[in-house]
């Protein structure tokens, strides 16, 4: 018999999981998401991606500011759910919420736990130069991403991958994994193991929330480190530098790059193809964004703004 589920999620990453749970025939009793927030040029209130998809599917949507009140906890209990599925929801779940569903609460986490517990596992994996990442279905306990693991899938990370690329790879993979986990739970076949028994990176690391102060590119770092920094922050908040354009220092976000040959003082433009010197070697810019403008290929940018040495980026 299909499970009666509560779904809790907010961003685009969570939408495929909601879709897969519905496709697998599970009953979604309620969808919890964050409240609508101002966005866009008009700063109009915009519902979250999960709220929009839930409304499209005809599912009831709740947007509590907290789950710590007795009222909110009683309301969640009233749904009589078998389990809750949590994907990048954004609110802390108190123990009363964790205990409410019959079989507990299950989280889809975008890393190979115990590596990169916390808020920004996708960004941190790319920034650290990890060889692989993945998704895990974990039964939530009182700790920060410390629960027992039910299922996992791995994917390689290449030098060409940005955080956006990895996000788009893991979202559908995780959706399928969670749906299969709930199918197994329905059959009474879901098995949990301790994170230390998963055969993944044994050292616990924490994926701190990305701070915009981290986004400034440091050209005096090694080229591969600069590449990982750029790709790990793409597209948001976007790694940036200042580039001299028509005598003015213009802030540019670099969204995609590749390793390149060349040598010079860190930050020096080495040719007319946006190859920039680092501590050792260089990177070539492939995609960038000026403030207030859409992202564009480097070739298109150079067509309108030709740049040649000598020139230094800060």
Swiss-Prot record:
Q: Give yes or no: UniProt keyword Transferase.
A: yes
Q: Which Pfam families does the protein's record reference? A: Formyl_trans_C, Formyl_trans_N
Reactions that this protein is recorded to catalyse:
L-methionyl-tRNA(fMet) + (6R)-10-formyltetrahydrofolate = N-formyl-L-methionyl-tRNA(fMet) + (6S)-5,6,7,8-tetrahydrofolate + H(+)
EC assignment: 2.1.2.9
Give GO cellular component annotations, separated by semicolons.
Answer: cytosol
InterPro entries in the cross-refs: Fmt, Formyl_trans_C, Formyl_trans_C_sf, Formyl_transf_N, Formyl_transf_N_sf, Formyl_transferase-like_C_sf, Met-tRNA-FMT_C, Met-tRNA-FMT_N
For this protein, the record's SUPFAM superfamilies field holds: FMT C-terminal domain-like, Formyltransferase
Please provide the record's keywords in A-Z order.
Protein biosynthesis, Transferase
- According to its UniProt record, this protein's enzyme class is transferase
Kindly list the positions annotated as binding (6S)-5,6,7,8-tetrahydrofolate.
Answer: 111-114
Instruction: Classify the source by domain of life.
Output: Bacteria
Alphabetized GO MF terms: methionyl-tRNA formyltransferase activity
The protein's role, per its UniProt record: Attaches a formyl group to the free amino group of methionyl-tRNA(fMet). The formyl group appears to play a dual role in the initiator identity of N-formylmethionyl-tRNA by promoting its recognition by IF2 and preventing the misappropriation of this tRNA by the elongation apparatus.
Question: What PANTHER family has UniProt attached to this entry?
Answer: METHIONYL-TRNA FORMYLTRANSFERASE (PTHR11138), METHIONYL-TRNA FORMYLTRANSFERASE, MITOCHONDRIAL (PTHR11138:SF5)
Q: Which HAMAP family would you find in this protein's record?
A: Formyl_trans (MF_00182)
Q: What is this protein called?
A: Methionyl-tRNA formyltransferase
Q: Which organism was this protein described from?
A: Nitrobacter winogradskyi (strain ATCC 25391 / DSM 10237 / CIP 104748 / NCIMB 11846 / Nb-255)
Instruction: State the gene name recorded for this protein.
Output: fmt
């Amino acid at each position: 018999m299909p499970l009666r589920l509560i779904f809790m999620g907010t961003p685009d990453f969570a939408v495929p999981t909601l879709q897969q749970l519905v496709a697998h025939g599970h009953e979604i009793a309620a969808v919890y998401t964050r409240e609508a927030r101002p966005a866009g040029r008009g700063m109009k209130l915009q519902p979250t991606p999960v709220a929009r998809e839930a409304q499209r599917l005809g599912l009831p949507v709740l947007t509590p500011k907290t789950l710590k009140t007795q009222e909110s906890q009683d309301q969640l209990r009233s749904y009589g759910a078998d389990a809750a599925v949590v994907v990048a929801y954004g609110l802390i779940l108190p123990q009363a919420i964790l205990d409410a569903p019959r079989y507990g609460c299950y989280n889809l986490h975008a890393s190979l736990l115990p590596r990169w517990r916390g808020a920004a596992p996708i960004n941190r994996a790319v920034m650290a130069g990890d060889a692989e990442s993945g998704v895990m279905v974990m039964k939530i306990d009182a700790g920060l991403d410390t629960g027992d693991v039910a299922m996992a899938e791995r994917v390689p990370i290449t030098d060409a991958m940005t955080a956006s690329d990895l996000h788009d790879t893991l979202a559908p993979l995780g959706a399928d994994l969670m749906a299969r986990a709930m199918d197994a739970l329905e059959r009474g076949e879901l098995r949990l193991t301790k994170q230390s028994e998963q055969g993944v990176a044994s050292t616990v690391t924490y994926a701190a929330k990305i701070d915009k102060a981290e986004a400034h590119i440091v050209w005096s770092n090694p080229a591969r480190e600069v590449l990982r920094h750029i790709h790990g922050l793409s597209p948001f908040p976007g790694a940036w530098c200042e580039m001299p354009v028509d005598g003015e220092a213009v802030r540019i976000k670099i969204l995609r790059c590749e390793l390149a040959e060349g040598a010079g003082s860190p930050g020096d433009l080495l040719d007319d193809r946006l190859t920039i010197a680092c501590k050792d070697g260089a990177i070539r810019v492939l995609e960038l964004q000026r403030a207030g403008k859409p992202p564009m290929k480097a070739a298109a940018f150079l067509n309108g703004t030709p740049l040649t040495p000598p020139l230094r980026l800060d």
